[in-house]
Amino acid sequence: MGVTVVSHPLVQHKLTIMRKKETSTASFQRLLKEISLLLCYEVTRNLELTTMSIETPLMPMEAPVLEGKKLVFASILRAGNGLLEGMLDLVPAARVAHIGLYRDHDTLQPIEYYFKAPEDIVNRLVIVVDPMLATANSAIAAIDKLKERGATNIRFLCLLAAPEGIERFTKAHPDVEVFTASIDERLDEKGYIVPGLGDAGDRMYGTK
């Protein structure tokens, strides 16, 4: 399905401020919510529309509305919740799935500790959100789980991606399109994206 890099000037400006090491936790949270609104606009750009009959204060008309499968936003905990908040502001009727994964710092492999998703996920477009696509291990594991539950129409949204992660992800799930604000240089020896922005979860919540 490929990779879409969202190059909108506002996205790039806000991402630069988020990258700065002196950006406070409060500012990081605010910027993450703002950028999630802009990224949500892009990842939902080609949703299908139909028309419905309405009446304006002046006259009846046929007006465009969303058609087809309803949305699920699937957040990879914990950092995914930062993107989720802004997206739900735009699409408050979307259902939500939570996928609890943490990365073993020695093996870099994901360990699942929680999974909760709507029962009718097979009938919905699922947009998986996680700020970082680094090794891609967590993203691959999350989408493996969603497919096990019947999801067939999936997109993945992140702030930053590493070339290594994109390569692994697209090989594992070639049917899932990736949307990101930036493809950075590489992964370091600890599996972090560089130049990156640090650990998104720690910067969101002020933890180490």
Swiss-Prot record:
Keywords: Allosteric enzyme, Glycosyltransferase, GTP-binding, Magnesium, Nucleotide-binding, Transferase. CDD domains: PRTases_typeI (cd06223). Allosterically activated by GTP. SUPFAM superfamilies: PRTase-like (SSF53271). GO terms for molecular function: GTP binding; magnesium ion binding; uracil phosphoribosyltransferase activity. 5-phospho-alpha-D-ribose 1-diphosphate binds at R78, R103, D130, P131, M132, L133, A134, T135, A136, N137, S138, D199. Pathway: Pyrimidine metabolism; UMP biosynthesis via salvage pathway; UMP from uracil: step 1/1. One of its GO terms (biological process) is UMP salvage. Its cofactor is Mg(2+). It catalyses: UMP + diphosphate = 5-phospho-alpha-D-ribose 1-diphosphate + uracil. Binds 1 Mg(2+) ion per subunit. The magnesium is bound as Mg-PRPP. Uracil binds at I193, G198, D199, A200. Its EC number is 2.4.2.9. The keyword GTP-binding applies. Catalyzes the conversion of uracil and 5-phospho-alpha-D-ribose 1-diphosphate (PRPP) to UMP and diphosphate. Belongs to the UPRTase family. PANTHER family: ADENINE PHOSPHORIBOSYLTRANSFERASE, URACIL PHOSPHORIBOSYLTRANSFERASE, CHLOROPLASTIC. This is Uracil phosphoribosyltransferase. The gene is upp.
